[in-house]
Curated annotation (Swiss-Prot):
This is Transcription antitermination protein NusB. Belongs to the NusB family. InterPro entries: NusB-like_sf, NusB_fam, NusB_RsmB_TIM44. HAMAP family: NusB (MF_00073). It comes from Vibrio atlanticus (strain LGP32). GO terms for molecular function: RNA binding. GO terms for biological process: DNA-templated transcription termination; transcription antitermination. Pfam families: NusB (PF01029). Keywords: RNA-binding, Transcription, Transcription antitermination, Transcription regulation. GO terms for cellular component: cytosol. Gene3D superfamilies: NusB-like. Involved in transcription antitermination. Required for transcription of ribosomal RNA (rRNA) genes. Binds specifically to the boxA antiterminator sequence of the ribosomal RNA (rrn) operons. NCBIfam families: nusB.
Length: 155
């Protein structure tokens, strides 16, 4: 199954999962509610949030992978944080929420999705950081994941 999925479909799933995880961290809504918002086109209550662009409307998105990443990170975020903590140079609560979402997403893929090579996980996280995080966040994300990879994944 994994071999037949196009890389672009996985890339889109990661992008939307990152955005959903970030939203979940900010709003503290039930993860099922966040998932539904993304699956239904990203519509938010406009009185409380800005209208979002339709999330999973892109034709090439691996929706099953999106769901796995989103729910997996939400259900295991404390465990993921404890795996990340030794490799992060500052307290976890001081991380930018986008950096935290990126690191959690990548750590989930490294520890739970062994069908995805760790180098792909790191590269995808770097590319997402370049698009969604602060200017030099991709360097920080790369450093953390490079240090963590040998400890959480057999090369």
């Amino acid at each position: 199954m994994g071999a037949s999925v196009k890389p672009a479909a996985r890339r889109n799933a990661r992008q939307f999962a990152l955005q959903a995880i970030y939203s979940w961290q900010i709003t503290k809504e039930n993860i099922a509610t966040v998932e539904e918002q993304f699956l239904s086109g990203g519509k938010y209550d406009e009185e409380e949030h800005h209208a979002a662009e339709p999330a999973l409307a892109m034709p090439e998105t691996d929706v099953a992978y999106f769901r796995d990443l989103l729910t997996g990170v939400a259900l295991s975020h404390m465990e993921l944080d404890s795996k990340l903590r030794p490799f992060v140079s500052r307290p976890m609560q001081d991380l930018d929420l986008m950096e935290l979402a990126l690191l959690r997403l990548a750590m989930y893929e490294m520890t739970r999705r062994e069908d995805v090579p760790y180098k792909v996980v790191i590269n995808e996280a770097i590319e997402l950081a370049k698009v969604f995080a602060a200017e030099d966040s991709h360097k920080f994300v790369n450093g953390v994941l490079d240090k963590a990879a040998p400890h959480v994944r057999k090369k």
